[in-house]
Amino acid sequence: MVFISGQTAWDERKNIIGRDSVLEQARQAFSNLEKAMESTGGTLKDIVALRIYVVDYQAECGTAVGAVLRETFSLENPPASTWIGVSALADPEFLIEIEATAVLD
C-alpha cells in the first residue's frame, strides 16, 4: 500500500498555481498526485481512496473539483472519495489538499 498526503497547488518551485481558483488548484494538486504516484512506480489507476479537503466548501467548489476528478480518473472504476470542508489549510492561499491511498500490484 502507498499513502500520499499533502498534495496541493504548489508547482515544482513552490509557487501556488490558481491562487483564487479551486478549479486550477485542483488541477495542479491532481497533477502533483500523479507525479507522486509515478515516483512510487504506480499510476493514478492504483489509487483506491481519496480524501479531498476544500476550504470554505460551497456548491461551486464541488462542481469544480468534480470536473477535475472526471478529467483525471476513469468513470468506470473511480477511487472512493471523501470530500471534507475545512476552515483553512497549511498555507492561507491553499484552497484544496488531497490525500490518497493506493494499492500497487
Model-assigned labels for residue ranges:
Residues M1-D105:
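Short, polar/acidic, helix-capping and beta-turn segments at strand->helix junctions
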